[in-house]
Amino acid sequence: MLFSSRFLALAALLGQALALPIDDFSQSDAGLKVKLTSMGNTRVKAVVTNEGEQEISFLKFNTFFDSAPTQKVQIMKAGSLIPFSGVDFYFNMANLPAEAFKTLAPGASAEAEFDIAATADLSPGGSYTVSSAGFLRIAGGNGTAITGRMRYRSNQMKLNVDGDMAAKVQSAVPTIEKRTRIDGNSCRGNYGQLLSRALQGCSSYAGRAAQAASNGDAQKFQEYFKTNSPQVRQSVAARFQAIVQECSSASNGKTTYLCEDRFRFCQPGLIAYTIPTQSVVANCPSYWKLPPVVNRGLEPDHGYVVVHEFTHATSIFSPGTEDHGYGYEECRRLNAQQSLSNADNYSLFAAAVSRGA
């Protein structure tokens, strides 16, 4: 998991209203080393070493070892962050498959190589600084339940990029031709009916959440966003109101919704994803295994996931959110800045005020 530009944009947007430490996770700071090296122009190799005394098993999603074009590094030029043009995934922390984990013995290293020009426009060329900071989710024993985190901070690597060569790197995310609000090819029959109901559920969730953010219970808002600043409450309500508008029509909107994985990014355990730069949302096969409607608790249903994905879409509300944490336990550990920029905090809040959780 990587902290990146949209997180900083939201923090800057609200300034002193969120003047809290950026990271207050309860997690390990020792035992993990990450080194980035250049493999030529825009190709980068990341080597992760377990310097601890125990074997670790970590979740690959949203890390260097994720085969999908998720954000793996932060790229800066002349002090400015380069926008990320890949995908944001949603997965259910309560249902992670064993194949989504990677194991590292004490002293062992694992490496991954990728091209940063596949998810960022580096065609101007010149000098760039590449780094990565975040955490790995650690599973306990031989299971798949996340029991801890290990923070890391890589070296800062300087790259002198040939812009012409970078421009020739194929984008990891093909551009689709937008024809309709809901893709008619993938959203036929039962999928189309279920998605229509999911949009209705999304509208209901977001509508109640907008009202609760505007003038609802202060303690409940504090629980999910770690502040009761009027400025923050106004911003959260505005995002929910924008989502209500997006969910209210199956024919008009700012996003394109795919009921199937046209890009072939889905893996076991992944439920849905958003491509913010294209305003595209796509469901994975696991999405259709979720219950269409959940009336109690905070577990995801179809409408919950739509709210989550729509918070990522900058065309609906800018800046879009990121994925600092998933599920109630992780999201409760986020500070105010992270909570405001985290997609699942919005879905959880919407579910809580709608279901009385």
UniProtKB/Swiss-Prot annotation:
GO terms for cellular component: extracellular region. Zn(2+) binds at H308, H312, D323. GO terms for biological process: proteolysis. It is found in: Secreted. GO terms for molecular function: metal ion binding; metalloendopeptidase activity. The active site is at E309. Residues 1-19 form the signal peptide. Secreted metalloproteinase that allows assimilation of proteinaceous substrates. Shows high activities on basic nuclear substrates such as histone and protamine. Belongs to the peptidase M35 family. This is Neutral protease 2 homolog UREG_02006. The lineage of its organism: Eukaryota, Fungi, Dikarya, Ascomycota, Pezizomycotina.
